[in-house]
Amino acid sequence: MASFFHAGLGRKSNWLAGVAAFVGLAACATPSTSFPVIPEAQVQAAALIDQRASVEARLDRLARVQAIAWPLLVENVGLCHERRADRFGISIGNDRTIRSLADGFTLEQVNAIGYDASPVVLNVSAGSPAALAGIVRGSVPVRVGGTEINGEMKALNGALADFTELREKAKEADRGDVEGASELPVLPVVFRQPDGSELEADLAPETVCSIPINVSERDAVNANTGGTSVNMFRGLLTYMQNDDDVAIVVAHEIGHVIGRHVPKQRRNSYTSGMIVWGVPLALGASIFDGFFGSALERWAGVETPPGQAGMTRVLNGVLGTRSFEREADYIGMYVAARGGVDISNAENVFAAFSKLSPTSTYGVRTHPTTPERQLAIKAAREEIEAKRAAGELLIPNDWPFPVPLEEDAALAETN
């Protein structure tokens, strides 16, 4: 017994010695060449340049999208029913805004590239009241209304809230809801420009569709909406270099929003869920969803509101999403045309997706196939061109929502 124990121990000791020798040799391995060693200060300086360029690139993408979207939001107020608001066409933020925009950056990194807690203009939509006044990216609000900003976001937000309240009261007076109708007020502002000069202006906001247009840094060639805002993916913006093509996609997503497709789809999901599962099986459906829901959705290509069982989402997506997509294409054509977009090539915009996904020509489960979309969009374009030739307002046929009275009157005249 003793000899066996010592023999085993000896073998184990030899094995451990071999491992130690191997680790030691690995630890001693070093490069063979004398490559240049860059001082840490230079590395950090180069990193700041790259980080600043990354933020600027994201702001450039945002500027491109919002410049494309601005005329769509302005010219389609008549179709946006209750979703309207007064806007200056300006985005102001601070270091926390940039940290949110540049996902993955720390607040310290954002501060190092030149942003702090004070408000600064991040974007101005081309053609907006702010742009026409001469405000640019990098401008700093000094005084808004009668409020000195002093680098405080709270002061800026308070001044804008006061102006909004004042303007709403004036609108009520103009509508005759209260006595003493008056002209709508403008907002006097002072901005310090990037060159150090001061700009004074009186800003009169424009009533637009209140639909935020955002940029997602995802690489997918895609865009989507959650029902109230639009997300344009970086991959799509890189893929589509023509702004009119991008505008067609933005208009399509706006079509989903003003068509109220997300709440309708959510309501359909709840209804179909009750039909498919019934109240007693709701718990079982949720358990089923936990195991198989995601796989079913991937198979069906469904991306619908959360909160329902997977089979319900798939059933609703397959049966209902195509019709909403068809309507978004149709409404989107009107949105684009009213916004001044060249729609002559619109039917070919979505054909680009067939190059990325050949099954879109025959096997799409939640969208119309590419050939069908092309033909339907072509028909919508011809319908719009006929209305233009006849001098009619560009309003989708059988539009179910109210439009401004002046457009109702004009529509009555053309009919």
Residue ranges and their predicted role:
Residues 233-235, 260, 281, 285-323, ...:
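Substrate-binding clefts and substrate-entry loops adjacent to catalytic sites
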Residues 236, 241-245, 254-271, 341:
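Catalytic Zn2+-binding segment of zinc metalloproteases
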